Amino acid sequence: DLLRLITLAGKEELARLRIEVDFDVERPETVAAYRELLSSIATKTNETTWDELSDIFEDAEREGEGIPAILERLSAYYGDRKSEWQLERIARTTTTGGANAGLLEAWRQSEVVEGGEWVSALDDRTRTSPESDFDHVHAHGETVRLGELYVRTGESLAYPGDPSGSPGNIINCRCTQAPIVIEDEE
């Protein structure tokens, strides 16, 4: 692991410099440097992965592709590093969140939609309590005005798949939302 590598490199460098001091990996400055390095590596790795995945999804969207074609693109990107179900989870999570974000933005721009209604898949794979901390069965049918958040899932979400939600609430979510149109007062 990285801490072991830092320790080994530190000890080797002290030996190379012929300094007879024990390398202290628990020294506050060393711990701080280790944490900063880990944070930087994680951030850069995530940024790089995000950029590459964004390109994959943008290309798929431009081509009008669905989840099966996206799975092929993800398989080519990840190779053997991810299983089929992991790739499907990535594709489903990203397309669900993206589609629902697009719906919400369209409603905001429409001037005829006043709110939304949460629509769950309602099958044996739909999240429900007590099996899950998040309840998409109970969320089914919840209505909110534009600008308000859905809360019945166990968290406040702007839409199904909202990335501000916890992983357990949005990963593999298959829910969508339906518009509530302003009634004509004729």
Task: Identify the residue ranges that each predicted region occupies.
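N-terminal leader/targeting and assembly helices and adjacent pre-domain segments
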Residues: 1-86, 94, 98, 165, ...
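Activation/maturation switch segments at domain boundaries
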Residues: 1-8, 12, 16, 20, ...
